[in-house]
Design a protein with these regions (language model features):
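Hydrophobic transmembrane alpha-helices and their immediate loop junctions
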Residues: 1-216
Length: 216
């Protein structure tokens, strides 16, 4: 499902559209909808930063488990702009959680707790220095300031493995103890699959191009 918004093409997967429709119909509590809103606000932070840098994205792809903002001109961005664009989604989540906390201190509504938890969880998750997450891509930008691109990618890959391996072990232990809590294990396996499936192009010594940076 594609929609043209100015110079940007918005692609929405059918599974995501079906799940969104089901949530709107079945979620009478509003909790799942708040989690969806947190994810949308995260992506909106990236779009706002791109807009501020006067570089609207060429395409936005939204699927059930991922979101990608395609910006083929990102190699022309200054380092500060690219870093701000990468971290803007996390910043929106933490800012929203802070606002929610202030509102909750004034009027302690149960849905505000869900709002705060959704934004904090999404912000902390994306801030992890793992490849394919915003934190990992921001770290890659910084590493490429000091190392060649191929070495920077290897360092990020090593750090990602060092984080995901114990996370998967802890997630498996939680599943055994609780019999139902599989969220952490599923997240670790999902990120590991992205890490394994990510295409890695060989770098030439004479020309060092940054890989495409997906924004989640």
């Amino acid at each position: 499902m594609k929609l043209k918004v100015g110079k940007t093409t918005l692609t929405l997967s059918y599974p995501l559209a079906c799940v969104t429709a089901a949530v709107l119909i079945l979620d009478t509590s509003g909790k799942v909808l708040l989690c969806f809103c947190a994810a949308l606000m995260h992506e909106g932070g990236h779009l706002f930063a791109l807009r501020c840098c006067h570089t609207p994205p060429e395409e936005i792809k939204l699927s059930l488990f991922d979101a990608a903002i395609i910006d083929r001109k990102k190699q022309l961005h200054p380092f500060s702009h690219e870093l701000a664009i990468t971290l803007s989604g996390i910043a929106v989540n933490f800012l929203s959680a802070s606002v929610g906390w202030v509102l909750y201190s004034i009027h302690p509504h149960p849905l505000l707790k869900v709002f705060i938890a959704a934004h904090l969880t999404l912000g902390i998750f994306n801030a992890l220095p793992v490849d394919s997450l915003d934190g990992g891509q921001a770290l890659l930008l910084i590493l490429e300031r000091f190392f060649p691109p191929d070495r920077a990618e290897r360092l990020l890959l090593l750090l990602s493995v060092l984080i995901l391996l114990p996370t998967a072990i802890i997630g498996f232990w939680l599943l055994l103890v609780t019999k139902y809590n599989f969220t952490l294990l599923l997240s670790a396996l999902y990120l590991t699959s992205l890490l394994l499936l990510k295409p890695r192009k060989p770098h030439r010594k004479t020309s060092a191009k940054r890989p495409q940076i997906p924004v989640s």
